[in-house]
């Protein structure tokens, strides 16, 4: 075999340049970059050194042969021609990995089988001995890559992927791979900072991957020094004496590195469940004397190194893949920016994020940005110098305004109540907090919210209303519906049309989310965001989350439960407030029927108004259970019936009479539990006819729906006395959107 080999080193996408620099420094020559890989030439000593010392590679592949390939037979014979007796004993074990397609190979499993068959046929002895397959820990791992008609056959010297260092046996929900974490540290300048005696802190450390990788860099520990089994361990071309020499050198360097004064490396994690797993990982890496982990929130993050040295703050905040994460993540990034400005002046910072728009909300400019991939997710590494000249102070604030803000900081009262020795509350000292920084658009949006609050204030106070809409896409570029539920804010983002640039829409959303707590004087932890878009079938009623948190609100003397987090709607349609109040006024002594009852809020109002009985019909058991809680919350008994069923089928089977009926159907609905599909425009006549058949003499039916294109069938006007009462059912908070719903009063003709 030759003294020099062609090597392929694979890596995560985006790390190719860094890996090329690292591999060249370790001795690789003629280095060239490819997508998610580099290649070059090296002797065996360099190949071993790359396996031991590469912090960035996934695998080190030693190329055995390249050959042209037109079909499966070319593949088989190309592999068969290799002298496999130089690489593996006949009774050894193999695993084959195949990548690429073409040349008659469209199935990687088939390609791997052809490679395996060729190796087995070559090594089969007259006595019948032959290699067997071991996919977990084979003696030899063979890789074949098919690239534009060329087959590249390699041995995998690394065995398991090199990112698996052996210390991280416990991990959190969204861990970074170790080699990606190392790449981020290198890009952030940690090797330089560590050499200068600088500190490192991670305010969201999870199970400590950044911390351990940083410790190994600072202590000059080879990342794979503790690996016991390699892809070359049973390879017949392995040179054990050379390997032991390099491994002993690495052990000596690690011993010398750990004997130095430890770098100050600290991690902080809000989730108490991750603290011990993080400490266990650090202990397995042998770095317990160097790295400490504590429980702590971002809001209280303040690194205090022993020698007061500066250093690097590094973190991988959540990105927000779930619907509704935007608000909480925006405030997390804002908090991170505030802590950097207040507690880390003159430090360097590195923020790795899959949501660069959120990174812009920290209020500090990044001086460099690098593109990475975390699996299939494109990400950015934002490098920041935490100095005042990099602080973003808001577009609309003049130097004079900033001076006023410095001299007159905002004060907020602490919610927590403390008692003196006599058991009486102690008024807490106000906490000085930094003024929120809004963009020009964000400030305009905040001004509109405050204007709306002022306009609605007198009406809200007079009516004693607890929940109301304060904004409904008043400014087209901020397409949101914002509702106040006592001291909570429910934000619904209307899905932007395809013609709108998604990045601009995202930036405006973040502007709005930054403005809402300040404009409405609401704690940012009490802002919930959802996205509204055209729903099909039962999707509009599907669960969005599973927090199960209910908030008690009041309306017209009744108490109602709302859930702001788990479903698209909250359990209370605010636009129907006037209709519910009308029902309460008219219900005394009457038998009330509520069709498509949802959470039966109208039934609660009817019961409050003195209804003789209420019957609520809905297809959803979940919402009927919610309705039962609403009724129980107000002390109403079993005279208030809850019926689960398809409304149309229920009406056809029912023979009772009712004095007051309310119908608020969905625009469209289908379910496994209902017969057919309901379409309000198509099925309105049948629905109203069935309901009117159950209306007692002198009774009233109220019909409403939210379908903006709905047209009431003119035949209904000929059959019954029909009055459009829409204008009477729109309160001031929905006056900006007169098409929020339509409503009619229907009675029998005299």
Curated annotation (Swiss-Prot):
Record keyword Metal-binding present: no
Enzyme class name: transferase
Entry-linked InterPro entries: 23SrRNA_methyltr_KL, DNA_methylase_N6_adenine_CS, RlmKL-like_Mtase, RlmL_1st, SAM-dep_methyl-trfase, SAM-dependent_MTases_sf, THUMP_dom
Domain of life, source organism: Bacteria
Domain THUMP: 46-157
Cellular component annotations (GO), alphabetically ordered: cytoplasm
Localization per record: Cytoplasm
Predominant localisation class: cytoplasm
Keywords linked to the UniProt accession: Cytoplasm, Methyltransferase, RNA-binding, rRNA processing, S-adenosyl-L-methionine, Transferase
Keyword Secreted: no
Record-level Gene Ontology MF annotations: 23S rRNA (guanine(2445)-N(2))-methyltransferase activity; RNA binding; rRNA (guanine-N7-)-methyltransferase activity
Enzyme Commission number(s) from the entry: 2.1.1.173, 2.1.1.264
Reactions it catalyzes: guanosine(2445) in 23S rRNA + S-adenosyl-L-methionine = N(2)-methylguanosine(2445) in 23S rRNA + S-adenosyl-L-homocysteine + H(+); guanosine(2069) in 23S rRNA + S-adenosyl-L-methionine = N(2)-methylguanosine(2069) in 23S rRNA + S-adenosyl-L-homocysteine + H(+)
PROSITE patterns for the chain: THUMP
Purpose: Specifically methylates the guanine in position 2445 (m2G2445) and the guanine in position 2069 (m7G2069) of 23S rRNA.
Protein name per UniProt: Ribosomal RNA large subunit methyltransferase K/L
Naturally occurring in which organism (per UniProt): Pseudomonas syringae pv. tomato (strain ATCC BAA-871 / DC3000)
């Amino acid at each position: 075999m030759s003294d020099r080999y062609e090597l392929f080193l694979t890596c995560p996408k985006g790390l190719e340049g860094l890996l090329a620099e690292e591999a060249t420094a370790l001795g690789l020559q003629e280095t060239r970059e490819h997508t998610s890989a580099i290649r070059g030439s090296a002797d065996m000593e360099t190949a071993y050194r790359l396996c031991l010392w590469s912090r960035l590679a996934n695998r080190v592949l030693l190329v055995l042969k390249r050959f042209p390939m037109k079909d499966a037979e070319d593949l088989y014979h190309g592999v068969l021609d290799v002298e496999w007796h130089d690489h593996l004993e006949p009774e050894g074990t193999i695993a084959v990995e195949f990548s690429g397609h073409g040349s008659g190979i469209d199935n990687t499993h088939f390609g791997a089988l052809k490679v395996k068959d060729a190796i087995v046929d070559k090594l089969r002895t007259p006595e019948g001995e032959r290699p067997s397959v071991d996919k977990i820990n084979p003696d030899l791992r063979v890789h074949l890559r098919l690239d534009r008609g060329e087959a590249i056959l390699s041995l995998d010297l690394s065995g398991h992927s090199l990112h698996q260092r052996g210390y991280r046996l416990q991990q959190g929900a969204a861990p970074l791979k170790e080699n990606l974490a190392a790449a981020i540290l290198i890009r952030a300048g940690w090797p330089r900072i560590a050499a200068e005696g600088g500190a490192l802190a991670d305010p969201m450390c999870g199970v400590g991957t950044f911390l351990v990788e940083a410790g190994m860099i600072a202590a000059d520990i080879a990342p794979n020094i503790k690996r016991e089994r390699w892809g070359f361990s049973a390879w017949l071309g392995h040179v054990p004496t050379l390997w032991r020499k390099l491994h002993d050198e690495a052990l000596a360097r690690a011993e010398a590195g750990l004997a130095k004064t430890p770098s100050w490396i600290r991690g902080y994690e809000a989730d108490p469940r991750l603290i011990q797993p993080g400490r266990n990982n650090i202990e397995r890496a042998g770095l317990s004397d160097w790295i400490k982990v504590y429980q702590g929130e971002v809001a209280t993050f303040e690194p205090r190194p022993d020698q007061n040295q500066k250093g690097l703050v590094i973190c991988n905040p959540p990105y927000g893949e779930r619907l509704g994460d935007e608000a909480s993540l925006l405030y997390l990034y804002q908090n991170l920016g505030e802590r950097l400005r207040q507690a880390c002046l003159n430090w360097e910072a590195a923020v790795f994020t899959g949501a660069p728009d959120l990174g812009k909300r920290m209020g500090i400019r990044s001086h460099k940005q690098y593109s990475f991939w975390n699996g299939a997710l494109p990400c950015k590494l934002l490098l920041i110098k935490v100095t005042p000249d990099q602080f973003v102070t808001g577009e609309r604030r003049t130097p004079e305004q900033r001076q006023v803000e410095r001299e007159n900081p905002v004060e907020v009262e602490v919610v927590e109540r403390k008692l003196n020795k006599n058991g009486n509350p102690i008024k807490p000292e106000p906490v000085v907090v930094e003024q929120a920084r809004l963009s020009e658009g964000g400030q305009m949006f905040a001004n509109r919210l405050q204007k709306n609050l002022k306009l609605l204030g007198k009406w809200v106070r007079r009516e004693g209303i607890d929940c109301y809409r304060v904004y409904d896409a008043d400014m087209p570029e901020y397409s949101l519906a914002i509702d106040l539920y006592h001291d909570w804010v429910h934000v619904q983002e209307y899905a932007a049309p395809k013609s709108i640039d998604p990045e601009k829409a995202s930036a405006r959303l973040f502007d709005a989310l930054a403005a809402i707590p300040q404009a409405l004087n609401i704690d940012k932890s009490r802002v919930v965001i959802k996205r509204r878009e055209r729903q099909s079938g039962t999707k509009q009623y599907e669960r969005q989350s599973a927090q199960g948190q209910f908030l008690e609100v009041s309306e017209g003397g009744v108490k109602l439960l709302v859930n702001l987090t788990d479903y698209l709607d909250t359990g209370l349609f605010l636009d129907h407030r006037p209709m519910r109040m009308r029902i309460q006024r008219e219900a005394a002594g009457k038998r009330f029927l509520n069709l498509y009852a949802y959470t039966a809020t109208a039934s609660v109002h009817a019961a409050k108004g003195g209804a003789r009985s209420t019957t609520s019909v809905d297809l959803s058991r979940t919402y009927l259970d919610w309705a039962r809680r609403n009724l129980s919350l107000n002390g109403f008994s079993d005279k208030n019936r809850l019926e689960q069923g398809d409304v149309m089928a229920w009406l056809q089977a029912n023979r009772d009479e009712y004095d007051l009926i309310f119908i608020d159907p969905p625009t469209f609905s289908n379910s496994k539990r209902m017969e057919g599909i309901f379409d309000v425009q198509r099925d309105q006549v049948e629905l109203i006819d069935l309901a009117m058949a159950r209306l007692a003499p002198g009774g009233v039916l109220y019909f409403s729906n939210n379908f903006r294109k709905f047209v009431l069938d003119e035949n209904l006007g000929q059959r019954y006395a029909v009055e459009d009462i829409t204008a009477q059912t729109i309160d001031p908070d929905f006056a900006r959107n007169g098409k929020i719903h339509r409503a009619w009063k229907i009675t029998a003709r005299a």
